[in-house]
């Protein structure tokens, strides 16, 4: 493992929408991220099920759409004081906060809260399921442009400069309208002085120095390579390797399997520079592990799904690759530290967890 190959962007993305996690739980996640040498915390703050950040001038967002979660579980939101605590805690741990409002898809919670985001003025019902791709902002709705500008201007103002605009899985958005809406979100961030991050579907609209996050290896990669040639930087989050909500095996109670199962060995056995054919190595900004919380309700749930795989993802982000024998031999000692912090973990096979 060579320190000289460390990536600049070493991140963890946490979904606080499908299930809500309060400030103290978010800070505990930060402690874990910092422990593993990560330097970015990406918080997914809006989706079909809920809206998690209070926005001045748009009280309906939290009044009508903050209490939703998957399966009807309790929701919640962060007010200005909560967000200040989160931001200060991140800074004190060497973490740059990267907040995300996901648009134009994944927007049922916003559409439910604000009649003016719907062309006919009729709000859809709240959503507690796990399907994706059915909701979208509409250019024709009277409040869309003002809403997009207001929420992203505020998010940029209260962030550390990086703002994620989403852009994924907009299956119900017509192509030209998608382009117009993505331009609307990105322009709002740029005009407010922020740096744009977006999911890979929005790669064609990114500019020099901005970042695209690659998550689905099954999608065509030409637009990502083309973006890299324009000077866009690439964050690698391949779902088959570092989506840490994937079940470890078929017997895992938590998690999902839409990208198969992901044991520790699969997270550890990959090389970022080989993920996308034709992608220049110098275009890779780094690696970001992700955890989506459809099935996770508590910090212990998060911890169990993150560990030990986050240790592997973080080592790849720091060093570029892993020597499995060396990594595996060191895990029992690392796990003793985890126990001191009150973290729980999956006892992946092939590791002598009781050694020492």
Q: Where are the predicted features?
A:
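Active-site beta-loop-alpha junctions enriched in small/polar residues
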Residues: 17, 46-50, 100-106, 168-170, ...
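Flexible, acidic glycine-rich loops studded with aromatic residues
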Residues: 206-210, 216-356
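Conserved, mostly hydrophobic/aromatic
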Residues: 12, 33, 97, 165, ...
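Residue-level detector of anion-binding/catalytic polar loops
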Residues: 39-40, 96, 195, 233, ...
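Active-site neighborhood of glycoside hydrolase catalytic domains
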Residues: 110-211, 215-232
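Feature activates predominantly on carbohydrate-active enzymes
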Residues: 1-134, 143-145, 149-160
């Amino acid at each position: 493992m060579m320190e000289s190959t460390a990536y600049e962007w070493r991140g963890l993305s946490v979904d606080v929408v499908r299930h809500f996690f309060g400030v103290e739980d978010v800070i505990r996640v930060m402690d874990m991220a910092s422990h593993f040498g990560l330097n970015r915390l990406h918080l997914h703050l809006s989706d079909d099920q809920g809206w998690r950040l209070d926005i001045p001038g748009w009280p309906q967002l939290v009044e009508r759409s903050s209490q939703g979660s998957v399966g009807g579980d309790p929701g919640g939101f962060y007010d200005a004081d909560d967000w200040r605590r989160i931001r200060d805690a991140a800074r004190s741990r060497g973490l740059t906060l990267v907040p995300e409002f996901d648009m134009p898809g994944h927007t049922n919670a916003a559409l439910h809260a604000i009649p003016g985001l719907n062309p006919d003025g009729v709000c859809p019902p709240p959503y507690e399921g796990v399907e994706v791709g059915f909701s979208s902002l509409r250019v024709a709705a009277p409040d869309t442009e003002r809403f997009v500008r207001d929420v992203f201007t505020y998010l940029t103002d209260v962030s550390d400069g990086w703002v994620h605009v989403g852009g994924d899985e907009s299956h119900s958005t017509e192509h030209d309208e998608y382009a117009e809406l993505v331009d609307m979100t990105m322009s709002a961030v740029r005009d407010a002085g922020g740096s744009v991050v977006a999911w890979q579907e929005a790669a064609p609209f990114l500019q020099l120095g901005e970042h695209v996050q690659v998550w689905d290896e099954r999608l065509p990669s030409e637009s990502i390579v083309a973006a890299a040639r324009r000077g866009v930087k690439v964050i690698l989050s391949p779902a088959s390797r570092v989506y840490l909500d994937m079940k470890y095996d078929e017997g895992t109670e938590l998690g999902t399997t839409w990208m198969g199962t992901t044991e520790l060995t699969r997270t550890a056995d990959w090389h970022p520079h080989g993920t996308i054919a034709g992608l220049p190595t110098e275009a890779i900004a780094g690696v970001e592990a992700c955890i989506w919380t459809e099935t996770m309700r508590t910090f212990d749930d998060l911890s169990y799904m993150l560990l030990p795989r986050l240790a592997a993802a973080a080592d790849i982000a720091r060093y570029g690759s892993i020597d499995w024998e060396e990594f595996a031999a060191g895990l029992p000692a690392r796990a003793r530290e985890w126990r001191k912090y009150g973290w729980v973990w999956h006892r992946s096979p092939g590791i002598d967890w009781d050694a020492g």
